[in-house]
Amino acid sequence: MESQQLSQHPHISHGSACASVTSKEVHTNQDPLDVSASKTEECEKASTKANSQQTTTPASSAVPENPHHASPQPASVPPPQNGPYPQQCMMTQNQANPSGWSFYGHPSMIPYTPYQMSPMYFPPGPQSQFPQYPSSVGTPLSTPSPESGNTFTDSSSADSDMTSTKKYVRPPPMLTSPNDFPNWVKTYIKFLQNSNLGGIIPTVNGKPVRQITDDELTFLYNTFQIFAPSQFLPTWVKDILSVDYTDIMKILSKSIEKMQSDTQEANDIVTLANLQYNGSTPADAFETKVTNIIDRLNNNGIHINNKVACQLIMRGLSGEYKFLRYTRHRHLNMTVAELFLDIHAIYEEQQGSRNSKPNYRRNLSDEKNDSRSYTNTTKPKVIARNPQKTNNSKSKTARAHNVSTSNNSPSTDNDSISKSTTEPIQLNNKHDLHLRPGTY
């Protein structure tokens, strides 16, 4: 009976024998191909014996395969694990280097470690085509990349751009603390600008210059998670990623707003420390400027109390406002409002005195006009003195003539002389000359 079954299924007998040998050798930790010569001969004898006993079967009959057939194969060895991350989380070389990826200075040699909070977002395959943008290596943070539209460059120019980008683009450092995130995001933004992605960075109004593509969003997400591990992100960044783990643009927009706020705080502190006021501007404008600065600093967590604010304000006062330093420095509980009351009082007094000065000047001008008209009226008087001088000269000549005629008549002349000696002599002495007695 057994010989008849063996004759009908000769391959099953051979396979079972080999399977038993293989299983026995695997359990003894021996190479399945390393079989002794005696065992090989026994196996061959059993197969020839079975072949000699089998009956002739029709050629058209098909022998069914045994699904439990085990061929002698070496045991499979699992591939070694590379690093602490499992192989299913590691990106392949083709996925890390899609077409055009190196144009952006992508660090393809670094494995992508996914966030624990979100599934892995793999970059697109090599079938996607990248738009090429002009190189803007080394641009400052405030300078956006020029928008190039949807134009494509030829392969030769793209290759030259790729080599130049690889040469100059430097990746950002690794984030190691949540407190270092404001400084780190500045270097990351500069890395994007140097990688010709300045157009996708949000501007002051929170909107980018151009629309970001899917490939650029993938690059943005992958580079962000490489250089900013999730355990070192601030709380507000984790809150954004918990809603949408790919919304890196919102993180950049919020970071830029915080940068501007920090810059405004620094400018307000410098302005408050260098206040100067001498009454050249209205007191209302000066008060509004100072109070707005103090309110902004208080809202941003930098509290300025009344004592410090008054000291900073009084230190910048000059001119007539300077004495407020000495009249108010003894009041410890003085407020900013009380100090500005004194400043307003001095300013109003200055304005009142300045308004009265134009009337005084106008009176002086009137007096000058009157003096000018008076000098004009004196000019005819000067001219009227000439006939008076001529009359005086005529009288002098007439007197001289009388004296000469009196010499001819001695009697009358003596009387005239005696009369003239008794009469006072009036001299037109312009230089205030005085004659000594006895000289005439």
Curated annotation (Swiss-Prot):
Induction: Ty1-LR4 is a highly expressed element. Induced under amino acid starvation conditions by GCN4. Its main location: cytoplasm. The record marks H401, N402 as: Cleavage. Keywords: Cytoplasm, Phosphoprotein, RNA-binding, Transposable element. GO terms for molecular function: RNA binding. It is found in: Cytoplasm. Residues 429-440 have a biased composition (Basic and acidic residues). Residues 153-165, 402-418 have a biased composition (Low complexity). One of its GO terms (cellular component) is cytoplasm. Retrotransposons are mobile genetic entities that are able to replicate via an RNA intermediate and a reverse transcription step. In contrast to retroviruses, retrotransposons are non-infectious, lack an envelope and remain intracellular. Ty1 retrotransposons belong to the copia elements (pseudoviridae). Capsid protein (CA) is the structural component of the virus-like particle (VLP), forming the shell that encapsulates the retrotransposons dimeric RNA genome. The particles are assembled from trimer-clustered units and there are holes in the capsid shells that allow for the diffusion of macromolecules. CA also has nucleocapsid-like chaperone activity, promoting primer tRNA(i)-Met annealing to the multipartite primer-binding site (PBS), dimerization of Ty1 RNA and initiation of reverse transcription. This is Transposon Ty1-LR4 Gag polyprotein. It comes from Saccharomyces cerevisiae (strain ATCC 204508 / S288c).
